[in-house]
Amino acid sequence: IFLEKNPNGIVVWGGPNFPPDFPSQLNYFKKFPLDIYVPIEGEIGFSNIVERGLKVSSNSELRKIILNSTIPGCISRLNNGEIKTEFSENRIKNLDEIPSPYTTGLLDEFFDGKLSPMIQTNRGCPFSCTFCVDGSDSVNQINQFTTKRVSDELHYISNKVKSNTHSLLISDLNFGMYPKDMEICDTIQEIQNKKN
């Protein structure tokens, strides 16, 4: 439907649920109508797509320019039909380099009482569970946001959230496994005691 309404649009998917081997990736591209897949963490690959898109002067040129060559951190279906990968370091080691979507105000409009806020305190998983896509070697290094960053987000959220919101989602793969997680729990408890 998207391409019917916008034939020059680019279909971009991303996330961890992508085959690790190239033959399976080719089959994935045959099965689904996508142009670009951004594996693992998305900030670098998606930023590279946006940077290339900003160089396009008209919507009619979008597909031609963006899909003309590979994009660092992405797997792309090029204009000639080839599936190509340009590898880059898609994992950000210092997660605090990523601006907070909360403290920058980007998520303020979603504090409407309909949604629950979600935070992430670390990325990666040290385990290699065969049933889990996150058990791969590419994400077994744990990278963490600093406790200060998480605390700042929690306090910001507590000042913005509506009184009918009773949940906070933590999207870590293994929250509670690291000593700093207790500090985060203490901050949550402190905020609850103050706000309730």
Task: Give the residues covered by each predicted segment.
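Low-complexity, intrinsically disordered regions enriched in charged/polar residues
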Residues: 56, 60, 65, 92, ...
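Short aromatic/basic micro-patch
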Residues: 36, 92, 144
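Radical SAM [4Fe-4S] cluster-binding motif and immediate context
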Residues: 96-196
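Glycine-rich beta-alpha loop elements in corrinoid/cobalamin-binding modules
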Residues: 1-88
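A generic structural signal for short, non-catalytic loop/turn and secondary-structure boundary residues
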Residues: 67-69, 91, 112, 163
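Amphipathic, positively biased hydrophobic alpha-helical segments used for protein targeting
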Residues: 25-26, 53, 92, 101, ...
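A short, sequence-level motif marking secondary-structure junctions
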Residues: 88-95
